[in-house]
A protein has these predicted regions:
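Active-site-proximal alpha/beta segments of enzymes that process anionic O-linked groups
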Residues: 1-178
């Protein structure tokens, strides 16, 4: 038995849309009854003046390039923010690293979360507190299925950004965000 999917081909041919892919229910996979996430409930205080939350994920970027000389705008932005520098990546690859960033777990649990529909606690809590969540991807978030695993409950989810080149997409993302 060798599992095979044609998701990208079907999207390219217009047979299914990215929204259809996000809503797919993979009934052929065994449901995980052992998934217990989160183990403890989140404890926090709701403030009358909630803070803005900006999470920037740059794929295949060496942290040593994060400095005033190489990335002055990002560096300047970070200087005026709270920075969390103790995060340890759960993988060297995009899929595992992003999964670990949002779930704080090893990507060995990827399939369990894909099947269960359980969303990251961060996203659940931001939605519960009525934060406006904007996802601005340069690459598609349909494959790997970040849209389904991380953001399926985010309203009006943007799964891709139009543009012929990475530069075009990055310019569009910057303009849309600002």
């Amino acid at each position: 038995y060798f599992p095979l999917t044609a998701t990208r081909l079907m999207m390219k041919l217009g047979v299914v849309s990215s929204k259809d892919v996000i809503k797919m229910n993979f009934n052929n996979k065994k449901q995980s009854a052992d998934l217990n996430y989160p183990i403890d409930s989140l404890k926090y205080e709701v403030h009358s003046n909630p803070k803005n939350v900006v999470l920037i994920a740059i794929d295949s970027w060496n942290y040593r390039a994060f400095n005033q000389d190489i990335t002055p705008h990002i560096s300047h932005f970070a200087d005026s923010c709270s920075r969390f520098t103790s995060h340890l990546s759960s993988s060297n690859g995009t899929r595992g690293s992003i999964f670990g960033l949002f779930f704080s777990l090893s990507s060995i649990y990827w399939t369990d979360f894909e099947v269960s529909g359980i969303q990251p606690l961060l996203i659940e809590e931001l939605l519960k507190q009525n934060y406006q969540i904007g996802i601005y991807p340069s690459a598609t978030i349909v494959n790997p299925p970040f849209a389904k695993i991380l953001f399926s409950k985010v309203p009006d989810l943007r799964t891709h950004t139009e543009g012929k080149t990475v530069y075009d997409r990055d310019c569009r993302i910057t303009a849309d965000y600002l």
